């Protein structure tokens, strides 16, 4: 049976998740989600208090608990180095000097060197100190079946209880 997992997002910059270039990918952050979700499972990202506050500070109003994205994992999870080397995802490697924010926010940043150690491409979202956290997730999740709402995130009329039979969890990561 397919499982559904949600989490509260603290950032929404196009990095994690990365909804660009025809697939939504989750290759950084949320290591437990990336380690435990598989093909057919659902993952949902909701706004956290921190994300709502950050958006407000930048003149954007979004609701707490708003659905930012929903994805069904449509492929077997890819080990991070396999994701990095997959020609389909070369466009998801960040280019810091690019004018296009979609190119700057690429999430395809980890590969293994000849000694089997993870290396990290320069990027605008994660410093080297995030490498251990990110690579502990082992996998990149890929979806061709997704809905990304970003700043147009929403809470349905009547709240999540109407759709889910209960309120949205207050935890950072939860089963739906």
Label each region the model flagged.
Residues 39-41, 145:
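Short, surface-exposed beta-edge/turn micro-motifs
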Residues 1-39, 47-52:
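Compositionally biased, charged N-terminal/linker segments
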